[in-house]
Regions:
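Predominant activation on well-ordered alpha-helical scaffold segments within soluble catalytic domains
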Residues: 44-47, 79-83
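A generic structural signal for short beta-strands and their flanking turns/coil linkers
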Residues: 28, 32-34, 42, 52, ...
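HotDog/MaoC-like acyl-thioester-processing domains
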Residues: 2-24, 111-162
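Hydrophobic beta-strand-centered segment that forms part of the acyl-chain substrate-binding groove
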Residues: 64-70, 80-121
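A solvent-exposed, acidic/Ser-Thr-rich amphipathic alpha-helical stretch
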Residues: 74-78
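Generic structural detector for well-ordered beta-strands
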Residues: 31, 35-37, 107, 113, ...
Length: 162
C-alpha cells in the first residue's frame, strides 16, 4: 500500500455537484475506488477479446512453473480498468457524458497475479475548460491489495460534457 493510500475505501462514490467545482481541486486526491477482483475468468475473457493468449496469462499449469508462479493479468487488462475504477470512485452530478481523450505516462510497475484485488487512487492533475465541459487529466495509481508499490500508474485524459 502506498503511503498516501487510505487503509479502506468507501464503496459509495464521492459525489461532486458540478464539473466546474473540480477546478478548485487541481492537485488534490479526489477519490479511492472499491477493490476489484482479478480472477482467471476476467483474464481469459480479456485474452479472448484482445487475441493475447500468452501462456503467462491463460495457462495456469504452465504459468505455475513460470517466472511469476501463477498466471498474471495482462498489463492492458489492468489499464482497461481505469473507467470502472473511476466510475465506482466518483460521480459528477451535472456531467451528461464523457469520452476518453488519451493517456500519458503509463507505466506497469509490478505484475498482477490471478486472485489479486486492485483499486484506484484518483488525483486531479489538470482541469481545462472546453466548449460544453472540461478536459480532465487524472493521475491514477492502481494498487494491489497487500503490495507496497502500485501495479500501474497513468495519466488518464478525458473530456466531460454537461
Amino acid at each position: 500500500m502506498t503511503s498516501e493510500t487510505p487503509d479502506s475505501a468507501s464503496s459509495a462514490p464521492v459525489h461532486f455537484a458540478t464539473l466546474a467545482s473540480l477546478q478548485a481541486r487541481v492537485g488534490q486526491h479526489l477519490a479511492t475506488s472499491p477493490w476489484v477482483l482479478i480472477d482467471q475468468q476476467r483474464i481469459d475473457l480479456f485474452a479472448q477479446a484482445t487475441g493475447d493468449h500468452q501462456w503467462i496469462h491463460v495457462d495456469p499449469v504452465r504459468a505455475a512453473a513460470g517466472p511469476f508462479g501463477t498466471p498474471i493479468a495482462h498489463g492492458f487488462l489492468t489499464l482497461s480498468l481505469l473507467p470502472e475504477l473511476a466510475a465506482s470512485a466518483m460521480h459528477i452530478d451535472d456531467v451528461k457524458m464523457g469520452v476518453n481523450y488519451g493517456l500519458n505516462r503509463v507505466r506497469f510497475m509490478a505484475p498482477v497475479p490471478v486472485g489479486s484485488r486492485l483499486r484506484g487512487q484518483l488525483r486531479l492533475k489538470a482541469y481545462e475548460p472546453i466548449e460544453g465541459g472540461a478536459q480532465l487529466t487524472m493521475e491514477v495509481s492502481i494498487e494491489r491489495e497487500g503490495a507496497v508499490k502500485p501495479v500501474c500508474v497513468a495519466e488518464a485524459v478525458s473530456r466531460r460534457f454537461i
